[in-house]
Amino acid sequence: MNKTNQLINICILVTLFLIGSSSALTLQVEPKSQECFYNFIESGKTSLLLYQVIRGGLLDINVKLTDPKGNTIFERLHFDTQMKGKQSFTAGESGAYKVCFNNEMSRFTAKVVTFTWASEEEGVKEVAKGDSITPMDQSVQKIERVLQSVIHEQKKLRYREQANRDTSESTNARVVWWTIAEVIVLVVMGVGQIWYLRKWFDNKSTGRV
């Protein structure tokens, strides 16, 4: 019974880690600009940054993460079609960590980025009682990693679906406007032909008189 209660408590803590300490944000990074966000992380805590470019150009963005002193933890030019946007790290000191999404390399195209920045909650590392981690704790940690991956993939699919829907709606709108333009051109041409024929017959009638 104790093991069952321990497993329940661990699962609750894992759930809090997954859904209580992170929030998904979606933003548009305009051309020749960057957007930065801060997250206060305590020393020794593990943090996970998940990000994805869902619309714009080649689905590329420059990502840079810095510590409270401004030192670069990692920086890369991310292509969403070539790699997963995922970076985990352990905070070396307490303070405000900063992530920046830079689109300065693009002159005309804005990029739509969605990201989740999750930080480890108090107690997650202290789940196991005693000095050693039990097989049950190891299983729960494995489940935690799997759940994180599943949640990330679900969000990726959802945002990709939204991007495809936006593209489809935009295409449909262009088709509608193109059809309207064609109708207007046909009407103008028809009116012009009728006017020309009437004028031609009027000239013929005048010539006979």
UniProtKB/Swiss-Prot annotation:
Domain of life: Eukaryota
InterPro entries found in the cross-reference section: Emp24-like, GOLD_dom, GOLD_dom_sf
Signal peptide start-end: 1-24
Transmembrane annotation, as ranges: 175-195
Principal location: membrane
Encoding gene, per UniProt annotation: empB
Keywords: Cytoplasmic vesicle, Membrane, Protein transport, Signal, Transmembrane, Transmembrane helix, Transport
Name by which UniProt lists this protein: Transmembrane emp24 domain-containing protein B
GO cellular component: COPII-coated ER to Golgi transport vesicle; cytoplasmic vesicle membrane; endoplasmic reticulum; endoplasmic reticulum-Golgi intermediate compartment; Golgi apparatus
Stretches assigned to the GOLD domain: 34-119
Membrane-protein topology: Single-pass type I membrane protein
Cytoplasmic side: 196-209
UniProt GO BP: endoplasmic reticulum to Golgi vesicle-mediated transport; Golgi organization; intracellular protein transport
Function: Could have a role in the budding of coatomer-coated and other species of coated vesicles.
Family: Belongs to the EMP24/GP25L family.
SMART domains cross-referenced by the UniProt entry: EMP24_GP25L
Organism in which the protein naturally occurs: Dictyostelium discoideum (Social amoeba)
Pfam family, one: EMP24_GP25L
Localization annotation: Cytoplasmic vesicle membrane
Topological domain spans for side Lumenal: 25-174
